[in-house]
Amino acid sequence: MTNSPRTAAIIVAAGRGLRAGAGGPKQYRSLAGRPVIARAMEPFCTHPGVMAVQPVTNPDDTEMFNAAVAGLNFRPAVGGGATRQASVRAGLEALAELKPDIVLIHDAARCFVTPELISRAITAAGATGAALPVVPVTDTIKQVDSSGAVDATPDRASLRIAQTPQAFRFDVILDAHRRAASGGRDDFTDDAAIAEWAGLTVSTFEGDANNMKMTTPEDFAREESRLMAALGDIRTGTGYDVHAFGEGDHVWLCGLKVPHTRGFLAHSDGDVGLHALVDAILGALADGDIGSHFPPTDPQWKGAASDKFLKYAIDRVTARGGRVANLEVTMICERPKIGPLRDAMRQRIAEITGVPVSRVAVKATTSEKLGFTGREEGIAATASATIRLPWGADGLAG
């Protein structure tokens, strides 16, 4: 069996990103609630084939960098140089003590890199020694002269757009960078160009059209909108219900018939757990409450099973193209004891709603003998619901 190559990654993050407009270096800007650099680094930090991640940053950005990537696992950042080329060389020299077989060099501004693309880069470098991801050119390209007049129309069939991570045998790209520096060449815009200059054959592999470089304000606006649309409109709601005890030998709790010394005084079956969940879901939808949909004055709901109400609330979410992400209910009572029933309650709620049981929580507490629940005069329940709706479900733009 062939051993996997020892692979390290360099994240180039020393640039100032002036074309992105005001707001500081683009790699530290928030994109849908998360810094660009954190999005760019995490796939490398968590990839099983990458043994070390070496950031290269501007020393003036240390505080921003540490805050942006907190929680990720990487080597201490090294300071970059005056050019991208100098910054990459600083990263290579920092990795020299590790002697990796393969190095991946990635721009921090490309924050949509995927684990699959990283794996392809490692494979390509292992096979050819030098490789970069590319995507086809789909637009017609015009070559112009200094006046802006069209000089030529290159055949786009032979053109490709270069991306990162670019992947190399570590020893050969380090040598190429050292030779370029000693020869006074500091004008290369990517590492594949340095490899070509050094006489290496650079192969290509399939890139990713989504692996774009965040460069302009328009890039940030477009990708912010796309990410927020994919995330969806997240809503939360809360609910509360209470029922007093009356005559009977059982109570309905979270969809279960539970033997008890008393029953509930209620128009329906009095299931406080499900009623609280219904109100939480309707609240997340801004769609009234259980009483407005199922009035206690309406005789058709006399003795009704509360699972009908909960299914109705779920259908209201589905009708708007949404889904329930999480349900939680807390029972407040002295008796009956909820602990032994917890898992069965979660399962029953999951069956009624279609929500995975892993996203259903049932908790219990007491009022420490205080109030009506402490005096065992009834049971109360609180609930919360988190739902996801598509942007525009209520007329709002994404």
Swiss-Prot record:
Disulfide bonds: none annotated. Its cofactor is a divalent metal cation. Keywords: Isoprene biosynthesis, Lyase, Metal-binding, Multifunctional enzyme, Nucleotidyltransferase, Transferase. The record marks R19, K26, H267, T366 as: Transition state stabilizer. The record marks R156, K213 as: Positions MEP for the nucleophilic attack. GO terms for biological process: isopentenyl diphosphate biosynthetic process, methylerythritol 4-phosphate pathway; terpenoid biosynthetic process. Residues 235-398 are annotated as: 2-C-methyl-D-erythritol 2,4-cyclodiphosphate synthase. A divalent metal cation binds at D241, H243, H275. Its EC number is 2.7.7.60, 4.6.1.12. The keyword Metal-binding applies. Pfam families: IspD (PF01128), YgbB (PF02542). PROSITE patterns: ISPD, ISPF. Residues 1-234 are annotated as: 2-C-methyl-D-erythritol 4-phosphate cytidylyltransferase. In the N-terminal section; belongs to the IspD/TarI cytidylyltransferase family. IspD subfamily. NCBIfam families: ispD, ispF, PRK09382.1. This is Bifunctional enzyme IspD/IspF. It comes from Rhodopseudomonas palustris (strain ATCC BAA-98 / CGA009).
